[in-house]
């Protein structure tokens, strides 16, 4: 990594080959991120990675492939100190490398000079495989999965106290060169129907309540251990003190308060 003196912050995706502070990567930018490779959880964060506590060294001389424009480029690895620690705020770049399935109903929305040729290509490929009649099922399944991945990725960033912020790859689909259907909104800034603005702000807002646990699924005999965190990027400072909580379900109604342990 190179820190430029006039920069106010460091924006990137890794501090060495294995010190990754983004949750997902294209194969040309391997190794892949924790959301692609690890067991689903809400405990992972980037703090040790940014502080250099689990750093590794590149010996130099080897070559790797990296994303370059819409293709790949082979570059030579230089020697890098795995203990490198940034001296400026760290921003995670292009978070959200999740490709939604194309919505073919969107084709009729192109009424001007721009023609969605990429949708024609995708349709032709599905027709060749005899799968076009199932595209709506694929769209719904992939969309639900991608939206959950977005949630996991953003919550990981918010759990990381050493990470100062993140830049989304895009909130909407990009239908220009290469085509990236990575948005929860389509190219016309319209919802794809997988999440409401209110639910999105539940994990992407100035103040977000987070539950930190090692896994999503617990056995009947297991006792879950959950740490509750509050991520606050708002203008005002959150005062420490007693925090009131309420847990409700069809069979549960628990209310109480607990003293906060850190600010």
Per-region residue spans from a language model:
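Intrinsically disordered/low-complexity terminal segments and short unstructured peptides
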Residues: 41, 195, 259-260
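Short beta-strand segments of immunoglobulin-like
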Residues: 213-218
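Proline/serine/threonine-rich low-complexity linkers at boundaries of modular beta-sandwich domains
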Residues: 189, 193-208
């Amino acid at each position: 990594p190179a820190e430029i003196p006039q920069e106010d912050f460091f924006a990137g995706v890794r501090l060495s080959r294995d010190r990754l502070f983004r949750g997902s990567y294209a194969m040309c930018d391997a190794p892949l991120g924790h959301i692609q490779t690890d067991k689903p959880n809400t405990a992972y964060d980037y703090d040790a990675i940014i502080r250099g506590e689990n750093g590794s060294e590149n010996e130099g001389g080897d070559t790797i492939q990296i994303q370059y424009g819409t293709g790949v480029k082979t570059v030579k690895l230089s020697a890098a100190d795995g203990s490198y620690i940034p001296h400026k705020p760290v921003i995670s770049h292009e978070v959200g490398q999740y490709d939604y399935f194309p919505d073919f109903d969107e084709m009729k929305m192109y009424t001007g000079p721009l023609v969605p040729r990429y949708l024609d290509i995708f349709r032709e490929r599905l027709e060749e495989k005899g799968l076009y009649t199932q595209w709506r099922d694929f769209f719904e399944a992939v969309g639900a999965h991608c939206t959950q991945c977005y949630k996991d990725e953003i919550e990981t960033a918010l759990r990381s106290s050493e990470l100062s912020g993140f830049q989304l790859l895009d909130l909407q689909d990009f239908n220009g060169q290469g085509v990236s259907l990575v948005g929860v909104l389509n190219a016309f800034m319209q919802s794809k129907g997988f999440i409401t603005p209110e639910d999105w702000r539940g994990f992407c807002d100035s103040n977000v309540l987070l539950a930190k646990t090692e896994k999503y699924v617990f056995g009947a005999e297991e006792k879950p251990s959950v740490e509750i965190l509050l991520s606050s990027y708002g203008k005002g400072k959150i005062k420490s003190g007693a925090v009131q909580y309420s847990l409700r379900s069809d069979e549960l109604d628990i209310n109480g308060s607990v003293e906060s342990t850190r600010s």
